[in-house]
Amino acid sequence: MSVIDFHSHILPGIDDGSRNVETSIGMLRMCREQGVDIMIATPHFYADSNRVERFVENRKNAYDKVMAENADIPHIMMGAEVAFFDGISRAERVDALTIEGTNIMLLEMPFVTWSDSVVHEVRDLIEKRHFHIILAHIERFLKIPGNKSYVEQVLELPVTVQVNAETLLDFRQKGRMFKMFRNGTAHIIGSDCHGMHHRVPNLWLGREALSKKLGEDFVKQIDTY
């Protein structure tokens, strides 16, 4: 079984994550030391400020710079953290933003109160476009005023729910997250790492916290998800 970090910003100079190759290599070495086998590189994609073709080109260039260092780092798979936008379920090129070789899309939901149309868009991504949707850092959307019923509707869809590792260390949030993992409404962990000194690679801390609370076998199940 491979240990996978499903959410990271380790590619240099492409978003608000790593600023340069040196930082990227440092982050990736930290991940290797923590036992991570596969890093899903998920730079931010915002449809209102980027074209898919240009994004994919920039992502490939950033990846090539990292690989040119020939460092001992985890295997990197290309993906994106796709910010929700109106019409996403009808956008023609979003298939290029899935995790390479799969139909899996890491989707960042709106940071405002959702709506029926948002729920319908997610449903259409699944049912009409046949994407497997991972909801990025679900914990950030649970406390948005008026969001409870919409979150519940989305969680009733066949989605995978990702939780940031740091949330499992936060005394204000970890109880709810452990409960979600226990009842099957949260499924995987991501570090959402952005740098060497801020929002650092910390997948192992989240895995350790989950293991202490729910058991080592439970964490191993995540690795087979």
PLM region descriptions:
Residues 203-225:
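Mid-to-C-terminal alpha-helical segments outside catalytic/metal-binding sites
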